Amino acid sequence: MTQVTVKELAQEVEAPVERLLQQMREAGLPHTDAGQVVTDNEKQTLLTHLKSSHKSKAEEPRKITLQRKTTSTLRVAGSKSISVEVRKKKVFVQRSPEEIQAEQKREQDERRAAENAARDKVDADVRQRNEEQARRHATATAAAAPAAKAEPAPAAAAPAPAPVVADAPASEDAAARAAERKKDETRRNESRTRDDDRRRGEAPRVSIKVKVKEKEKAPTPRAAPRTTDEESDGARRGRGGKGKLKKRNQHGFQNPTGPVIRDVTIGETITVSELAQQMSVKAAEVVKFMFKMGTPVTINQVLDQETAQLIAEELGHKVTLVSDTALEDSLAESLKFEGQAESRAPVVTVMGHVDHGKTSLLDYIRRAKVAAGEAGGITQHIGAYHVETDRGMVTFLDTPGHAAFTQMRARGAKATDIVILVVAADDGVMPQTREAVQHAKAAGVPLVVAVNKIDKPGADLDRIRNELSVEGVTSEEWGGDTPFVKVSAKMGTGVDELLEAVLLQAEVLELTATPTAPGRGVVVESRLDKGRGPVATILVQDGTLRQGDMVLCGSNYGRVRAMLDENGKPVKEAGPSIPVEILGLDGTPEAGDELSVVADEKKAREVALFRQGKYREVKLARAHAGKLENIFETMGQEEKKTLNIVLKTDVRGSLEALQGSLGGLGNDEVQVRVIGGGVGGITESDANLALASNAVLFGFNVRADAGARKIVEQEGLDMRYYNVIYDIIEDVKKALTGMLGSDVRENILGVAEVRDVFRSPKFGAIAGCMVIEGTVYRNRPIRVLRDDVVIFEGELESLRRFKDDAAEVRSGMECGIGVKSYNDVKVGDKIEVFEKVQVARTL
């Protein structure tokens, strides 16, 4: 560190030595001579003293200057280059708190002055408007005065408005000058405020005055005089009334501050375009939203109710779900009828397990042999009969008992008043017996239990009571409400007691109907007859059905051309609880559809077409939704093998039963798809459908016509006829099993343990083994195991016993084994001989 004396420091700062010594003494330093040394700390102390004496304390600078210099090279034509230097300078000044407070106070004063000026301007405008209205009223009164006074001379009325007109220009000029001065002052204040805000980097304040967009003045009628507003505006502008006028008290359009919520009404189905229209958005927006949800749609796509509700709620709208049943409601209203109710016969459904004797019991009651006419001895249709007994008329419905006819039994329970549950005394309660009990309970129908085959050895009534009590059916003998009757359909034992129990239950139910009302009923069965067309079996539930009535049945309609009873005899009318077959419908209705007599054909056609379209839309919407739901589940999976079937049956109930049974077959690899089904014979269109879709033709109690047989023979289609439902199900199961292919299974034939290893010039390492399990065969695949771990898999090349080739070596014998392409055999290894067998897979 360089030594500096007081004298040298005085020369450096260009100050006299005496003055410097005096300042050092004032700073409290001990220097008194010019030759004394001054250290750096003493210099700092002196500098601080000098700054404080000049009222400039050691603090951060209030002004900062930033300089930036950048140099770049600019190339010009040829090899010349020019250096460009850009210099930027920026100065930041920190203001004191006093200046900031003064600035804020000045801004507040200016803002308050601007607001006062604007308020004064508004008050002046209001006063001016009131004056103008008063002046306009006075002018109008003066103009109307001459017309009102017919008697006096015109000259006498003229001087009256003169004072007002004379004073008008003076007051108008004064008001205009005052308003102009206030307007200029307000404009200067606003300009000054905006300049200050711009200097501070703030957003300009918005004046409380609402600026209104100038618009063209509407042309005035030719006969109207110049208004006072125009005169005053012209005077204020000083342009003689020329130019555009400002409209006062006009509000411009304001954007909505929040989202607009619409009330969206959604029926069972709705298209994308209709949904967008109700939400007041473009259809493309809805399509885009659904694409984001992972659902590709078009504007004409039909959406189901749940999907449309989800979209509308996600977009923030209120949803109201409605049912498109206005037409149905009007139809129901028109079918109401008031009349005298009378008692009617009970409708009794006979239910129970297959082969428990339901049809045989009915045969005895009807004195007819129905069971003998059914294929395979089992009932495959719903039979409807009405029987006149000594105690009154009873209508019976005979339902199938096989597992495939669950839907038929459910329909039978829904259309009935009483259920006779037939249970074989020697067989007990079976699965379909339990199902019949469940159907009866679901429909709220009372039960009468008929314990059949009571004459057979091994009949145990107490066992039946025990098993049914588990299902919730308790006999009257045990304190319940269900009568148990012992019967024998073969011998006729107990049939009278059974009918008495049924009629007793009917009296308790007090069954009534109105015979004078239009007929109403339910479809028990339907089929397509080759000569007569669609034939439907109807159970009339209320009113009277007559020949010639126009009927609506589900999505079908038509006029009743003919009516037949269960024996095939024509009848003219059918009352309550009477089953009949009707002809004249335009198609085969679904079993379970309700039939109603309507007033005219127009109404029937309208409702039928509405139901058809509604069913089609709902079906398409659900199919599309299901397809979209499964698109990600099936992605990456192998496609299922499908057995396509075209199925034709004699009646609609059998078609439903077969479709339900066949649809339940299959697994994750194979499935059954009924691509075409209908009632009636096999036609050319069915054969062409089977040809186009590579399907199998099944006919249940129907046959193919000549055209269909020709196509089947030419194209080699597979067509099969059946009359028992078991056979169809078994054949389809076999076909699906064949489509599954086979599995490869490994069978271990034998195991040999290596006792020693020899070397052979021909085969290499030869393992001397003892067969410890099974039999070892030559030319079979083997595995080499070491410590129970597979280390090699190959083929057995050489097998010898006592130097002779052997085809096989049994357990407990020694042999030499040569493993093909493997020489690393060690003592203690095990050689496992196996074979691969293909095994057929099952469902």
Swiss-Prot record:
Residues 452-455 are annotated as: G4. GTP binds at residues 352-359, 398-402, 452-455. Residues 398-401 are annotated as: G3. Residues 377-381 are annotated as: G2. PROSITE patterns: G_TR_2, IF2. InterPro entries: DNA-bd_dom_put_sf (IPR009061), EF-G-like_DII (IPR053905), IF2_assoc_dom_bac (IPR013575), IF2_II (IPR044145), IF2_N (IPR006847), P-loop_NTPase (IPR027417), Small_GTP-bd (IPR005225), T_Tr_GTP-bd_dom (IPR000795). Residues 352-359 are annotated as: G1. Residues 50-72, 94-260 are annotated as: Disordered. GO terms for molecular function: GTP binding; GTPase activity; translation initiation factor activity. Residues 237-250 have a biased composition (Basic residues). Its main location: cytoplasm. Belongs to the TRAFAC class translation factor GTPase superfamily. Classic translation factor GTPase family. IF-2 subfamily. One of the essential components for the initiation of protein synthesis. Protects formylmethionyl-tRNA from spontaneous hydrolysis and promotes its binding to the 30S ribosomal subunits. Also involved in the hydrolysis of GTP during the formation of the 70S ribosomal complex. PANTHER family: TR-TYPE G DOMAIN-CONTAINING PROTEIN (PTHR43381:SF5), TRANSLATION INITIATION FACTOR IF-2-RELATED (PTHR43381). This is Translation initiation factor IF-2. It comes from Pseudomonas putida (strain W619).
